[in-house]
Amino acid sequence: MAEENKNNENFQYIVRIANKDLNGERPLKLALADLKGIGLRLSETIAKKLDLDPDQRIGELGEDKIEELRKYIEGKVYDGIPYWMYNHRRDITTGKDFNLVSNDLDLQINDDINLMKKMRSYKGIRHERGLKVRGQRMRSNGRKGLAIGVVRKKEEKK
């Protein structure tokens, strides 16, 4: 496999997309799935939308194809992909659907949690207190902190 790469002068061992270095030897669908915010199914859909082979190694793509892929992923709205595949639907402020990648996704999630805390919603209060948010049981599971053992009294020698 390494010999095949050496024969191709244009092969890129590292491809940078959305501020992340991707391994050029991995197939396109698996390399894109390494990005936070893009799963395997979305990566296959993006590859088909851009007329790329999902099983082709990402390092074998030409510079123009990689640039096209980079612009498509870093743009928040993907043309031709259904809204239900996006990871951020019905934004609170704009009401639009879009897909966020890497740091943008982390920042948006933190902003949403802080907004819930500020509004004093039920979920926000649970986030503030560090409790479970989605209705899970609390009696026996989800305990945090170290267990404090029982201290026994020292027995007196007779």
Curated annotation (Swiss-Prot):
It comes from Picrophilus torridus (strain ATCC 700027 / DSM 9790 / JCM 10055 / NBRC 100828 / KAW 2/3). This is Small ribosomal subunit protein uS13. GO terms for cellular component: cytosol; small ribosomal subunit. It comes from the Archaea. InterPro entries: Rbsml_uS13_C (IPR027437), Ribosomal_uS13 (IPR001892), Ribosomal_uS13-like_H2TH (IPR010979), Ribosomal_uS13_archaeal (IPR019977), Ribosomal_uS13_CS (IPR018269). Keywords: Ribonucleoprotein, Ribosomal protein, RNA-binding, rRNA-binding. One of its GO terms (molecular function) is structural constituent of ribosome. SUPFAM superfamilies: S13-like H2TH domain (SSF46946). PROSITE patterns: RIBOSOMAL_S13_1, RIBOSOMAL_S13_2. Located at the top of the head of the 30S subunit, it contacts several helices of the 16S rRNA. In the 70S ribosome it contacts the 23S rRNA (bridge B1a) and protein L5 of the 50S subunit (bridge B1b), connecting the 2 subunits; these bridges are implicated in subunit movement. GO terms for biological process: translation. Part of the 30S ribosomal subunit. Forms a loose heterodimer with protein S19. Forms two bridges to the 50S subunit in the 70S ribosome. NCBIfam families: PRK04053.1, uS13_arch. Pfam families: Ribosomal_S13 (PF00416). Belongs to the universal ribosomal protein uS13 family.
